[in-house]
Amino acid sequence: MIKIYFIAGEVSGDFVGGRIMQHLKNNTGVQLNSPVSSFVNDAVQFVGVGGKYMEEAGSFKSLFPITSINLMGFVEILPHIFKLKKLIDKTVEDIINSKADLLITIDSPGFTYRVAKRVRKLLPKLKMIHIVAPSVWAYKEGRAVKYAKIYDCLFALLPFEPPYFTKVGLDCRYIGHPIMEQEFYSDKIALREEFKIDENERVLCVTLGSRKGEILRHLSVFVSSIEEIFKSCNNLKVIFTLANPAHEAIIKPFLEDVKFNYLFSSERLKIYAVADVALAKSGTNTLEIAASGTPMIVAYKVNLISFFIIRLLIKIKYVTLINIIADKEIIPEFIQFNCRANLISNKLQELLFNSKKAYEQVIESQKILQQLGFKSNRLQLNSESFRHDEFKGKLARCTKVREHRLSLENSLVSSDRDDAVPSYIAAAIIKQEFLEPKIKLLKEKD
């Protein structure tokens, strides 16, 4: 029996891990005439740390909830430092006791790197793969050397990342970004009916993140921004997307006295598609919102000490990946001291009421998404598609294609072939280069 030990520390990593597990179970990357292809499902066992996606993918039970390690920031992490150290010790011990044949860590470098470093000293021959290259192009380029000393292989999500690691001797493969595996919704009218959105309502999507600290840090300014918008847009409906249903209880106390209509939903991709505009916390969600064809602004702040430390370390002008790749501000950013209600509300209103501005942002964002691996057919967009009038009354109900969305079929389309998606590519490499030789040895022993 071959054991693969996975470690994912947050929802995005859990999604990637779950998809890779599914492809590994489906004999990804093993030739059909291979003597090991029919042996794979019985020969490989998944263990480690993960979430619901990894648990749904197979007989996998997490060593502990990933919410325990879903932390970030220099100062924010301090109150949890002793708890994290215990979890690192527990994970290292579990890896050794499991007699794992392969360790796969996914993102969450604050936790996964420390675990891998300890394990490398104790098990120098254990094969290790890390998925999601650290952003050495943004800050601390020296981390590439550190990763090269520990890992056997690194999977990068961005096409320009491998050279940073190959030049220091680490085998780094570009597999593409996981958002290419998402299915984005295109029928805005049907979604408005599903969420019982009146034909006259304008929809603002709000994302606050997956960490409790992030949510609490942004709630006051986000709610104040929305209240400002409501003064001039009293037909506003706000939908808060929830990374975890339990987060509703955190948000509700901040909404006790508000006048605007709101609801909560965990179906984030549907909400991104149905929204007229989004107020987003910086992160992977911004790529998903852009892929859904929705204009947005990004706002983010951290603890003040963390901010100044980051300012000393970081060497890029933007925090949003689309802006970083474009090297210009396509998506408006309101970071730290600029994360203020008046600035945020003014820009959101501009996107709500200026269809030309909203259209231009979506088109420019789409060009960057294509660089990340999305395929693009002829665009079905025109500036009039952003007029809210098109979604009113009978005209909206009769119109089939007139939507201000970049549809999966017509604009931002991932390949319909499984072997073009990142998790398939990752699973193929894992199986062909790391598992197949082991499985052949097991077959020979039998």
Swiss-Prot record:
Q: How is this protein named in the record?
A: Lipid-A-disaccharide synthase
Please give the HAMAP family that the UniProt record associates with this protein. Answer: LpxB
The alphabetized UniProt keywords are: Glycosyltransferase, Lipid A biosynthesis, Lipid biosynthesis, Lipid metabolism, Transferase
**Pathway noted in the entry:** Bacterial outer membrane biogenesis; LPS lipid A biosynthesis
Q: Per the UniProt record, which residue ranges are transmembrane?
A: none
The keyword Lipid biosynthesis is assigned to this record: yes
Q: Where is the RPE3 insert domain?
A: 379-418
Report the sequence similarity comment from the record.
Belongs to the LpxB family.
Q: Domain of life of the organism in this record? A: Bacteria
- State the organism's lineage: Bacteria, Pseudomonadati, Pseudomonadota, Alphaproteobacteria, Rickettsiales
Q: Does the keyword Lipid biosynthesis apply?
A: yes
- Record function comment: Condensation of UDP-2,3-diacylglucosamine and 2,3-diacylglucosamine-1-phosphate to form lipid A disaccharide, a precursor of lipid A, a phosphorylated glycolipid that anchors the lipopolysaccharide to the outer membrane of the cell.
